[in-house]
Amino acid sequence: MQVQLETLGNLERRLDIALPLTDIDAEVQKRLARVARTAKIAGFRPGKAPLKMVERNYGASVREDVLGEQVQLGFSKAVAEQKLRVAGYPRFEPAADNDPAAGEFKFSATFEVYPELTLGSLDGKEVEKAVCEVTDAEIDKTIDVLRKQRTRFNRVERAAADTDRVIIDFAGKIDGEAFAGGSSENFPFVLGQGQMLPEFEAGVIGMKEGESKDVEVSFPADYHGKDVAGKTAVFTITVKNVAEAILPEIDADFAKALGITDGDVSKLRAEIEKNVKREIARRLAARNKEAVMQVLIDANPLELPQSLVMMEISRLMHQAKQDLAQRGMDVKSLPDLPADLFRDQAARRVALGLILAELVKANELKASPEQIKARVEEWADSYEHPEEVIKWYYESPERLEGPENLVLEDNVVEFVLSQAKVNEKAVSFDELMGNA
């Protein structure tokens, strides 16, 4: 086998390979002999047809299979000899001047290689580490949210006020003409939640059941309804019902409704505190991991094999379609999503994959069995029967790959934080939970 390597670019390579036809022909004859033992050819009993007849019927397909295998085998040997790290899949092309009389089959393989990566120093690199203290106030806020989720409304005979639920009829006109979406009957909404435009809500506040009035409302220029954006409408509003919000008391009934079977309010608070702290820890870990990953990318600029980026784009596109399908959309009728929509995300994921692999290898980072077990137990704790979840994970080594990879990422984060300059930043509970 003859091999010639050519560098086409920073990461692109081409191997020109010549395979001896004697090896290919020998393998073809060996395969045909095997096929002949069971070949069914008209006029002959199975396995009794002459080899020439078998070759006439099956020779082309057998030769094609053998040639494909020999090309792949020859490429693998050449790559090993040249000590190349192939990224993605090669593109094979037969040589234009192939001549059987020359006794060889020539082809080329064009491909990309992994970039040489020398990890950048983390000394002096700054990482912003978010921290969040969970106090009684945060627990109280969470309990308040749970109470509001169980709000009931009692009808009242007074003017509508903030937090009241009102049921109204309304009909809007612009320049005296009705417009699409501008009217409704028996429409319920809660004042103060921002469901309606501020001028509309302000007009309803102070109205009583049975009262009607006209309210002028200006639609913002960037309003989602383009037909009315930037225009002024007059709404005739009739209030049909006013009801005030009644929050449940924090008592045994409330605790039971949230799964505390004996109604012990102190147990409820302890359970909520545990869940809040777990969620805070999860969000902090995700936020800090993202900060660490950005530091690694900034410290290790590298050219990416585009074959790997395209593979990741395909994976992300497939994942996006699956997500849409799970939401009930008919993805078959949708046009293909543009690749550029995923390019930046794909490039980031490929870069991080290369950097993390090198970092783990260079620093011999591992996920210990104890860490993996702790992660599985943490996940299982949120289920009704944790022991069954733990058993399920440990029934198959493949199932442990997920928690193992996440633990390894956590170890990378801890390693980077131990090497870089860490600046702690206090983050409020509301900001972390997305309520700010």
Curated annotation (Swiss-Prot):
Entry EC number(s): 5.2.1.8
GO molecular function: peptidyl-prolyl cis-trans isomerase activity; protein folding chaperone; ribosome binding
Enzyme class: isomerase
GO cellular component assignments: cytoplasm
PPIase FKBP-type domain boundaries: 163-248
One Pfam family matching this protein: Trigger_N
PROSITE patterns tied to this protein: FKBP_PPIASE
Record key words, sorted: Cell cycle, Cell division, Chaperone, Cytoplasm, Isomerase, Rotamase
Any one of the GO BP annotations: protein transport
Catalytic activity entry: [protein]-peptidylproline (omega=180) = [protein]-peptidylproline (omega=0)
Function: Involved in protein export. Acts as a chaperone by maintaining the newly synthesized protein in an open conformation. Functions as a peptidyl-prolyl cis-trans isomerase.
Cited PANTHER family: TRIGGER FACTOR CHAPERONE AND PEPTIDYL-PROLYL CIS/TRANS ISOMERASE, TRIGGER FACTOR-LIKE PROTEIN TIG, CHLOROPLASTIC
Domain notes: Consists of 3 domains; the N-terminus binds the ribosome, the middle domain has PPIase activity, while the C-terminus has intrinsic chaperone activity on its own.
HAMAP family membership: Trigger_factor_Tig
NCBIfam families: tig
Name of the protein in question: Trigger factor
